[in-house]
């Protein structure tokens, strides 16, 4: 498995049988490097969305039309995407598991909002924000938390799914900050590898993972902090 960070919460995950984008926020992402786009979309099989905010939906519509990739998201967000001309959709909701060829995706809780703001300035709710747990045939189980605060039912995510890889938001203001994210990882999970995200993009969120790294001192997990465009191979 190759996991490439594309800035903010965007990741490209490649296995022997799938090429996946999670939350492909490219256009307008201060951290994204345009030269990464071609490789990130080549041969793409799936786009997975944690929630409906623009910095997570990102370029989904354009990429889905360009590649024909299947898009998985919560039901309300899928209905909105359908109105944008996307037909290969896999709608679900919290607690549901969907088979996507060589892997499954399970919607789990996240404490956050999910909406799009139209040109008139009105915010329209697009279902629940979620984390996503991905179970693969022959690869480690991965948990992308989406945008969230710490919550005690993270213990159930560990009990039910036993994720080996955790992708964790740490940037503060819109998600938990680094110290709280480290507490969540240390208290509730037994990750082999932990990858922080949702930092170093917009100036109003934390710019480095240092607080998170300090909070993970003594943990048995590997904390991987690739540069944007860098990858972790497992």
UniProtKB/Swiss-Prot annotation:
Belongs to the UPF0173 family. This is UPF0173 metal-dependent hydrolase R01310. Keywords: Hydrolase. It comes from the Bacteria. The keyword Hydrolase applies. It comes from Rhizobium meliloti (strain 1021). GO terms for molecular function: hydrolase activity. It holds the Pfam family Lactamase_B_2.
